[in-house]
Amino acid sequence: MRDICMHYGGLTRPSQTASSQISLLGENFQVHYFTGTSLPCLSVFKPIYFEGGVPELGERPTNKYSSKNYWWRFEVLHRKIQTNYRTYIADFLKDKNELQLKIIEKEVDFRKKYLEGKVDKCELSGLTKWAFDEEEKLLEKWNDIVKVGKLPLFYSMNWGRVNKKAGLIF
């Protein structure tokens, strides 16, 4: 594997990263940051605690597009950004990285309070839900901003075929 973040690239790279995880495994406490979405370079890592669980994320994913599915809602934005990458990437990453830092800072504070006995398991699940909700706001904002651009011919043909098979039309 050449990269941690593997973007679909047609014949030379016929698949892409589906989800990513970073785990902090302390002796007294573990937190697992998951994207739950493709392309970690464009995704937000959310803290998930086995003690707290995962919030409801909509219908289960399949290989067909559904606006009711968490993964597909983000996949639409990821694919739109790729069609106009240079136009949007700097501003998008600024917003995404600011949110990521906010999530990390809040998680570090919660973890400290949990270890001190000041936060219970219910509050851990609340932090996870808050992180997903904040990410959803980022998605809504950027789906409104990003306009579909034009990809190089062969790359566009490959993505067109993949999108058509999934029932995804821009």
Set out the residue ranges of the language-model regions:
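C-terminus-biased signal that marks the final domain/tail of proteins
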Residues: 1-170
